[in-house]
């Protein structure tokens, strides 16, 4: 891996560009992301619970 001054400078310029473009989410966007994440976690949990119940019924009866 060859690290030189130009590659470090280029990386820092890219980081600066990303930080300039990015913004803090407003309350509405934050709540939407939180709701979608929560619903996704609940759905994955329900799928795991249903699979657990089905496997117990099929293999332990």
From Swiss-Prot:
Highest taxon listed in the record's lineage: Archaea
Keyword NADP in record: no
Compartments (UniProt record): Cell membrane
Biological-process GO terms, alphabetical: intracellular protein transmembrane transport; protein secretion; protein targeting
Membrane topology: Single-pass membrane protein
Pfam entry (one): SecE
Residues passing through the membrane, by range: 39-59
UniProt GO MF annotations: protein transmembrane transporter activity
SUPFAM superfamilies hit by this protein: Preprotein translocase SecE subunit (SSF103456)
Keyword Nucleotide-binding (UniProt): no
GO CC, one annotated term: plasma membrane
Keyword line: Cell membrane, Membrane, Protein transport, Translocation, Transmembrane, Transmembrane helix, Transport
Subunit structure: Component of the Sec protein translocase complex. Heterotrimer consisting of SecY (alpha), SecG (beta) and SecE (gamma) subunits. The heterotrimers can form oligomers, although 1 heterotrimer is thought to be able to translocate proteins. Interacts with the ribosome. May interact with SecDF, and other proteins may be involved.
Family under the similarity heading: Belongs to the SecE/SEC61-gamma family.
Record function comment: Essential subunit of the Sec protein translocation channel SecYEG. Clamps together the 2 halves of SecY. May contact the channel plug during translocation.
Protein name, entry field: Protein translocase subunit SecE
Species of provenance: Methanosphaera stadtmanae (strain ATCC 43021 / DSM 3091 / JCM 11832 / MCB-3)
């Amino acid at each position: 891996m060859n690290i030189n001054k130009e590659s470090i400078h280029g990386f820092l310029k890219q980081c600066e560009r990303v930080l300039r473009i990015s913004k803090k989410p407003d309350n509405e966007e934050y709540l939407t992301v939180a709701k979608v994440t929560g619903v996704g976690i609940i759905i994955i949990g329900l799928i795991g619970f249903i699979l657990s119940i089905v496997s117990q019924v099929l293999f332990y009866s």
